[in-house]
A protein has these predicted regions:
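A membrane-interface helix-boundary motif in multi-pass transporters
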Residues: 149-169
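Extracytoplasmic gate region of multi-pass secondary transporters
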Residues: 2-54
Length: 185
């Protein structure tokens, strides 16, 4: 009914769904793509997940101060760049640092998206939050099979290429959000 709701759904699909997807995906990535033992793979994944979850709060606070649109666009730009960087051959330590950039982007954008719901859908915040949260979480089920398919197609490059899905979605959301923000104003 309200087009901006779908803009917010896609935004949350990309970063909250992405958070869920990579929390499930990273143990396999660290073991198979980077050759790490399962304990270290689990530890790196835990740091990624905890950081993204904790950064929702400062993402929301910063959105209160400077606006959710600015925080969201900055976080999505960071995600787009980090998705590209995950394709550059580097050691596991540098790759982990880039994964933390993705975590920062996810956390900040998730906080910003929740700030934007009452801004764009003030007449139906509760219902819109249901749509944004419910359909946004669906990204957690969509991304892993797509990433797995890329590994099937190209075992050597597929793990890195999977992160380009986040680059693509981040850029798509930035474009849609830009035009959605113009329409709202």
């Amino acid at each position: 009914k309200i087009p901006q709701t779908w803009m917010l759904v896609l935004c949350y699909f990309t970063t909250f769904g992405g958070f869920m997807a990579l929390t499930a995906w990273f143990p396999t990535f660290w073991k198979k793509a980077m050759g790490l033992d399962p304990m270290l793979a689990g530890g790196l994944t835990a740091v990624f997940s905890i950081l993204a979850a904790l950064l929702r709060v400062p993402g929301g606070r910063l959105s209160d101060r400077i606006g959710g649109e600015k925080v969201s666009m900055g976080a999505l730009a960071l995600l787009a760049v980090a998705g590209i960087l995950m394709n550059i051959p580097m050691g596991w330590g540098a790759t982990f640092v880039v994964s933390l950039l993705i975590s920062v982007a996810f956390g900040f954008n998730n906080g910003a998206t929740m700030k934007l719901v009452p801004v764009y859908v003030s007449e139906g915040v509760g219902g819109a939050n249901g749509w944004v949260g419910g359909l946004g979480a669906f990204g957690g089920f969509v991304f892993p099979p797509l990433m797995g398919r890329l590994v099937d197609i190209s075992p050597q490059y597929g793990y890195g290429l999977g992160f380009l899905l986040f680059t693509f979605f981040a850029l798509l959301v930035m474009i849609i959000n830009y035009f959605g923000m113009i329409r709202k104003k």
